[in-house]
């Protein structure tokens, strides 16, 4: 519902000064007005299950940030219907009583768009067998340098794709262009670029041209918020893959995520180089391992950045810890820019490249040739087979 539609609904329900309220306050006022009239109303949100067993329906438009318009979900409902973090849940809710702060879910009407009783016996995502990536990500429309990097290291659905970049090496521009190409060429996939702990002025730049596909936390947010945002998006991606869909989450960056987790997780007693707790690394590795192509379902693809040559010990530790874990790596070289990133072709690779191209012999030959024969216009608009043919 757009802000104007929300205001119109609020005014129709008799909410005072509706156009002066923030969106979260307006949503809460509309829910309360509905509840006052009928005793109960309906709500839908993305479930976050907390450590004590209860949960809340979060607002996706608010990037899952905790708010006063969240709906409380009891532990008994979560157990009964086998609900998990990331599920889209719809149901009947009631207004908070005097001693309560939140609306409460009375009845679960649907989970992931289906009847709630279909879900208690779902197989756990992490327990499902994974297969090799066989569907190539289509990057037509991306800048020529990105298309040529794709020639050397094709990317596939269900992969763990690591983008290593030095400071000011064009990483931010690359991520934006990459996400735009994924959104344009994979309309049925759920594509989200999530940037955490960024400068406030960067937040608006990242979202330009990517409405609905960007989630951001800024350096003004606490570390727990950075962690929660990334985890919610990855868990939402798992639920999408479980029902046969495809989700692509682009994370900027794993280094900042490790720093945030280092401040959030209980100390394990094992501190590594750079004052990084071993428990924080475990959390990053567990999340990174989530990417996969399910044999009998969809795929969760993770694309993540890692800063190199930054002088920060945490970045060095993460590079060591994640060595050999990526399905593909794109490595940026110094001297690039947001408009024209430069790739270290020798270090850029894809472990499953041969499964992602139709003519393996032609691809091998093309990848060994100089790229000067491909014009920028052709690189940006051609599909991968055409690029291979141009260099064959």
Predicted features along the sequence, with ranges:
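Short, charged beta-turn/beta-strand-edge "cap" motif at the junction between a beta-strand
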Residues: 77, 93-99, 167-168
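P-loop NTP-binding catalytic core
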Residues: 83-85, 96-163
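Residue-level signature of catalytic and energy-coupling elements of molecular machines
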Residues: 6, 26, 55, 74, ...
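Glycine/charge-rich, flexible interdomain linkers and switch-proximal surface loops
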Residues: 38-53, 95, 99-116, 250
